Amino acid sequence: TGSGKYNILHNDNHNLDLTGKFLECSRSNPNLSDYNKYSAILDYLYKDKLSASLGVAHSGLLDRTDLSALGKVNLLNDKNTRLDLFGGLTKSMSPKFDSGLKPNFGLQLESSF
């Protein structure tokens, strides 16, 4: 198992990170096969207000690849509450299955007391 994060760009207004992960799964049961999982995510953040990410993950267990493109905009941010609007598309593919593009959107509210 391993992971890494590399900051490509960082200044007062912009932040761009690339994250990669690798997971090797070895099974103790000889009837189950071992498999690997890989993933990478590119994250962009503008002034802690607007963010976007592109992701890809592949699992050898099901020979499945997942793709995602997501965005988020902050609508409210005070010392106790944060409200974000998010939206994006996801897609899962394997040799026997393709989910097509699936939209994903909503509001996210975080509050601390």
From Swiss-Prot:
Coiled-coil zones: none
Main location per the UniProt record: secreted
UniProt entry tagged with the keyword Secreted: yes
Any one Gene Ontology BP term: innate immune response
GO cellular component: extracellular region
Subcellular location as annotated: Secreted
Keyword Secreted annotated: yes
Family matches, as InterPro entries: Attacin_C (IPR005521)
Lineage top rank: taxon: Eukaryota
Keywords (A to Z) from UniProt: Antibiotic, Antimicrobial, Immunity, Innate immunity, Secreted
Protein family per UniProt: Belongs to the attacin/sarcotoxin-2 family.
Role of this protein: Has antibacterial activity against both Gram-positive and Gram-negative bacteria.
Protein name as it appears in the record: Defense protein 2
Organism: Lonomia obliqua
